[in-house]
Structure formats: C-alpha cells, structure tokens
Amino acid sequence: MAHVPARTSPGPGPQLLLLLLPLFLLLLRDVAGSHRAPAWSALPAAADGLQGDRDLQRHPGDAAATLGPSAQDMVAVHMHRLYEKYSRQGARPGGGNTVRSFRARLEVVDQKAVYFFNLTSMQDSEMILTATFHFYSEPPRWPRALEVLCKPRAKNASGRPLPLGPPTRQHLLFRSLSQNTATQGLLRGAMALAPPPRGLWQAKDISPIVKAARRDGELLLSAQLDSEERDPGVPRPSPYAPYILVYANDLAISEPNSVAVTLQRYDPFPAGDPEPRAAPNNSADPRVRRAAQATGPLQDNELPGLDERPPRAHAQHFHKHQLWPSPFRALKPRPGRKDRRKKGQEVFMAASQVLDFDEKTMQKARRKQWDEPRVCSRRYLKVDFADIGWNEWIISPKSFDAYYCAGACEFPMPKIVRPSNHATIQSIVRAVGIIPGIPEPCCVPDKMNSLGVLFLDENRNVVLKVYPNMSVDTCACR
C-alpha cells in the first residue's frame, strides 16, 4: 500500500507579505525615530544622558531625584557656543551684555515630575530683555503606524471603526513660588505643545513669565510637562534636563571697578589682624604711619619716596601682620677654617654664575627697552586669570591680551600720539617753563575693546558677560 504524505496547511501567500511589508517598514522607522538623539543644531547629543531617567524609574518615590551630569552639561555646551559666537562676531548677546543660565532640579510632586529653577542670582541692575525655556521634547508613546495596528479604536453604530483623532498634545505649565511657602505657587503660564515625530530640543519664549515673577519677588519657578498619554502615577521625565536662559542688560557693568565687583570672589590681601582695618594715620606706631603714606603715591601718580626703615624692619613689620613668612633664615653654626677653605671656591663659582645670570637678564631687559619706542604707544600685556586667582570660576578665556599704554608725551608731540587740544597746550606751557611744576601730558588708552567672559556665579550657574574697556586698541596723549 502506497504511503500518502500528509497535506500541510498552506503558509501566507506572497501577496499578503507584500501588502504588510510597507506597513512594517513604516513602523520600524517610527520606532527608531522615537529613540533618536536630540536633533537641535545648537546642542550635540549626549551618549549617556538617560542615566538620570533610569535612576528615577528605578526609584520613583524619591522626592529629590536629579538627572545625571551629562544631562546638565547641555547648559554648559549651549553657553560655550554663545560665548564663541559673540566673541567671534563682536556683537552684544540679545542686544544686552549678560546671559544667565539656570539649571533645573527635578523633584517628584504628587507623582508628577516637576522641574524647579532658582533665579535669585539675577542682579537688580540687570534689566531682563528676553527669557527662553529650553527643553527636550519626546515623541508620543504610540507612533501613528503603531497606533493604527495596536491601539483599540472606537466604533460607530454600524460597527465600523471611527477615524483616529489628532495626536495627543502636551501641556507645559509654569508656576512661581515665594521663598516662604512650600506650595506649588501661582500659575504664571500654560502652553500647549504638539509632540514631534522624533525627540528634539525646543525653545519657548517665557519673557512675560520671568518678568512678572521678578516684579512680584517670586524668583523660584517650576515647570511641568504633562501629556495625556502618560500613565497616571508613573512619572516619566525627559531624559535631558531643561534649562532657562535670561538675556539681560546690566546697567552697572559700565560703572568703575565693575569687573572686580562681579568676578572677584575674595579680597586678594585679606587682613587677619583687625589692626590694618583701623585708620593708619591715627596709629601710634610710626612704622604704620609711614606704611600708610607709602600707599599715597599709587593714587596721585607721584613717584613714591624712600622708606627710611631698614630691610629687617620691613620684614618684621610684614611678618607681624602675617602677609608672608619671614625671608630671613635661621643662622647656621660658623664652619671651621678648613671648611671655609674647601667651600671658598664653590661659593665663588656659585656667585659668579648668579652675577652672570643677572647681567644677562639686565642686558636683555635693556635691549628690549631700547627696541620699544620711547614715544607714547601701546605695549604688550597678557593677563592670565590664574595669576590673579580667578581661574577657579572663570571658564573662558583662560587669558587675554590686555595691552597697556606707556611712553613720553614731550613737546613737540607727533600726530601719531593723537594729542588732544588740551594736551597740546599743556605740553607747550611745560616746554616754555613760565609756570613751574606743570607735568607733561599722560599716555593713556584712547580706544578700547570689550571682552566676553564665561564664568560661574555664586550658585554655580554659567554666566556670560561682555565687559567694556578690557583691552587697549590705541593710545594717545591726554
């Protein structure tokens, strides 16, 4: 008896596979696009920016969960791009001279992810021009292709499925809080956002919100991004921390000594002893009175006089106030006659090397001084912020070319020094010599350039300020 093979059920026809293939390709494209890195041109993608999101999902009940450092670095990257832009173009940021960034702190309030911003570091002299809120917008959890296949749809009376509604919208809520309350505060604004097809960075203008909050003295803002797609009770914050940029015009930046007021964190010469804080001229110690008089010529452009104190008195005076340790070493036992004979030649050779080194240094300094023009001109000066102790909070630049003006303004003054009419008359009167004691005009900066500085404020927020009159362009006799 012949064996008849069992008949198997036919597989899916090739026509059905051809019909489903475009749909699956569309589904794969939407799913891949939902996990794409940020597409905003101003900020590069961060490879490990999801670490904070994973930590929050692992511990959803944490009331003070914060995002990882890579998510917060997006603020530093954006501010550095602004610094490079305005340093290269020489323009003013947003029509002003200050850009402040404020990082977000993530907290879970009532099972919702809320971002808090502390704007209290803004100065009273800073007039707000614009404020922008930068956030990473995620795609919807149900892409359109997947929503067609998997999401249940309502049906009409005849049993046919109803058409899909518009994509789910997100709501961005802003509230202001006072420092004396723990509630969510007053609702300052709300925005409806359409979810993008893929994750990208967006920026929204919140100038009225920030200005109103500052006017009312409520500089603690909260931002909350809600979506109807989110499951209740499961906070799903953005994998990248949002931040706020405030463009302002600092009216006090042109005041005298403004760069030291904003950038100097401490006194470079701290007084540990209360004695220097008293009026030196009223002190009974004559050495203190002479020290106070020695600082006068620095303020009246006169040459300082010689101090009659011996060097040892200088050292004892400064050592008393602990400005620096005493330069004098302890006396060693006097060596014997034989030891002095052995070391005599070595001491002579060492002294000769020091004298040769000093002579070479002096010759080099003299040649450099001879090469420089004696007339008033711009001289080179490079300032390194590490030398003055400001490198701990200044991000960029590390150093800059400040230049300075030096040289003579003698009669007759050439046109290259651009003398003013008053300087010309003063030089003539000095040359004639009728009125004694008239000094020659001074070599001072004529045109100066501004400098953008990127630094950290007291709250560790990145700030960009454009300081005027930081670098000498030309010099003149005045």
Curated annotation (Swiss-Prot):
UniProt-listed Pfam families: TGF_beta (PF00019)
Primary localization: secreted
Tissues and organs where the protein is expressed, per its UniProt entry: Expressed in femur, brain, lung, skeletal muscle, pancreas and testis.
Residues that make up the propeptide removed upon maturation: 34-368
GO annotations of cellular component type: collagen-containing extracellular matrix; extracellular space
Glycosylation sites: 118, 156, 281, 469
Subcellular locations according to the entry: Secreted
Molecular function via GO: cytokine activity; growth factor activity; protein serine/threonine kinase activator activity
GO biological process, one term: response to kainic acid
Source taxon at top rank: Eukaryota
Function recorded in the entry: Growth factor involved in osteogenesis and adipogenesis. Plays an inhibitory role in the process of osteoblast differentiation via SMAD2/3 pathway. Plays an inhibitory role in the process of adipogenesis.
Annotated protein name in UniProt: Growth/differentiation factor 10
Name of the coding gene: GDF10
